[in-house]
Amino acid sequence: MVAFGKYLQRKQIEEWSGYYINYKLMKKKVKQYAEQIQGGSQHPRHVLKDFSRMLDTQIETTVLFMLEQQGLLSGRLAKLRESHDAILEQPDISRIFELREAYRDVGRDLLQLLKFVELNAIGLRKILKKFDKRFGYRFADYYVKTRANHPYSQLQQVFKHVGVGAVVGAISRNLHELQENEGSFYSIYDQPVLPAQDPVVEAINNAVDKLTFSTNFLNFLAQHALIMQDDLVTPSEDTIDERSYHFNSLLLNLGNTFLYMVNTYIIVPTADDYSMSLGAAATVCGVVIGSMAVAQVFSSVYFSAWSNKSYFKPLVFSSIALFIGNLMYALAYDANSIALLLLGRVCCGLGSARAVNRRYISDCVPLRIRMQASAGFVSASALGMACGPALAGLLQIKFKFYKFTFNQSTLPGWVMAVAWLFYLVWLCISFREPLRDTEDGEKNNRNETTSDRVESSRVEEGLRLPLLITSGIKPEDEEECDESEESPEDSHKPANSFIEAYRLLTPSVKVQLLIYFMLKYSMEILLSESSVITSYYFSWTTSSVAIFLACLGLTVLPINILVGSYISNMFEDRQILLTSEIIVFLGILFSFNLFVPYTVPQYVISGLIMFVAAEVLEGVNLSLLSRVMSSRLSKGTYNGGLLSTEAGTLARVVADATITLGGYLGRGHLLNATLLPSLVICIGSIVATCCTYNSLY
């Protein structure tokens, strides 16, 4: 908060200074309102109306100026079009160069306008959050309800922007035409290879994507990864040196993600048979599957902490732990030991390096391609989820070699052990440890000149100075600071413990984590008990279960394409969120076996509805979570990705425990006994969503 006032002054265009939101005034007003309410001199309702009116005026000033500038840019483009048509009739190479540069000048001015809108959008978000911190969502409920959803809302004009696409399209198309015309005057040896897209147009598109939180398929996938970044970071200010970025290392992290998801789901179709072959009940499959998740609850924390110092060593440890765990899982059959089986799965869970994979993308991949890397992380997870059961369906062979048995129960362990061994070799050969921040700093210090050091120290000193002067006379234009605000260092300081991270969770964040828990719980119930339920009601074989689970996994990417490319462009995220929750509720409700004999169509259709809706819900849920979560949770050990991972892993643990406990009621009652908690949690999440609906923006 404190840092943003100076950031706004530093980044704003001087000629446009009168059209930026008056962040300092609104911040002072918030403090003044708090004092008035505490003193009893002002009613909260009057405060809401007064501040809403002031914010409306600020937004109106910004929007009208934005539209005015767009009109000026459009007028310049219209005049350039006349010159363009004249050049097409009488080609002149010098005039083509001039016209291209004129179009680029318009593009640069449009880029400045987009940065203007972006600064105002960030300021609005921050002042809304500040008001929420002071008054507990009363203002957000009121303002968002009465402004954001209005058909003539100027608030949406700021966040969504209007008419920019037409200007960008005109600049891009005309530059492309001029490039083609220019090429006709040169031989192939004189004309250098032109880029696929003009750098100015590419910069504009990047600014548009950043401003609008573009909801295309790639970004929608990236939101699943919950790899957060600061609002104030731009590609030009990205601190990650692209020369130190290593593609093979990123590929190895994505490979780790893929193999771990395969490892998680490859045993699901055969876990009940394996349990019975060792003398346990079929429903013990819940413990077998869930033991990996139990270990992951703890491994996520130490892997996240370990990634503060190294990325290579945690990945090596992960590979070794998973290799040993899968060997133990495979050998449990010949040892006739359920304990060895469970210990093997626990060992696999201790090798869960998803926190490292997320952290590597967040900290070591340049901002320019971070969205693609995040989408790759989600795609690798989805592909692994589909490949696991499919691979289990292919391993329907049985033979014995020396003293070791190879069958449908043990082969998943043997195959994954070999896979992790090959991965470990590849890791040792190809992975390159990135430079840490301290190493980068030392390297930069050796290279920068004395004047650079002086200038850098001045900038850093200016950023560290408090905005409230504590001695002497305070200038009138100096920003005011109050006790509720964090210092610049604290506002970017990561949380150092789960308790500190929990204190940063607002009601909206807690509700989103509850929703994430609910959807992971429901999906785990559906997947983990599928082999037990289908064998009891329909006498399905392992191959049939594997095909069913693989088909469910294969729906992930198509559904994300549909939602990310189309549905999310037509509806708000919170509308999709609530609708998806209701559909999950209906899917759970239709899955119950109550009055009529249970049939395959009922099970498959209800399961498909529940799974697909949960996948849609996950993407939207994590998208909203990344927006409402504190920026202090974007980095460090106890980050937003770790919190969501822990919530999802805990849900899987509870779900698998529910399956095992439900088994004591008998296989005939297992279905309803496990669906009932899912139904209750789903209803609770819907109610919680309705209570915080107006704060989800």
Swiss-Prot record:
Any one GO CC term of the record: membrane
Keyword Transmembrane attributed: yes
Membrane protein topology class: Multi-pass membrane protein
One annotated GO molecular function: transmembrane transporter activity
Transmembrane segments: 247-267, 278-298, 315-335, 337-356, 375-395, 411-431, 513-533, 544-564, 576-596, 604-624, 670-690
Domain SPX span(s) in chain numbering: 2-145
Localization per Swiss-Prot or TrEMBL: Membrane
Signal peptide: none
Keywords: Membrane, Transmembrane, Transmembrane helix
Keyword Metal-binding on entry: no
InterPro entries: MFS, MFS_Domain-Containing_Protein, MFS_trans_sf, SPX_dom, SPXM_SPX_plant
Annotated segments matching region Disordered: 439-459
UniProt cross-references to Pfam families, sorted A to Z: MFS_1 (PF07690), SPX (PF03105)
Principal location class: membrane
Classification via Gene3D superfamilies: MFS general substrate transporter like domains (1.20.1250.20)
Protein family according to the UniProt entry: Belongs to the major facilitator superfamily.
Protein's UniProt name: SPX domain-containing membrane protein At1g63010
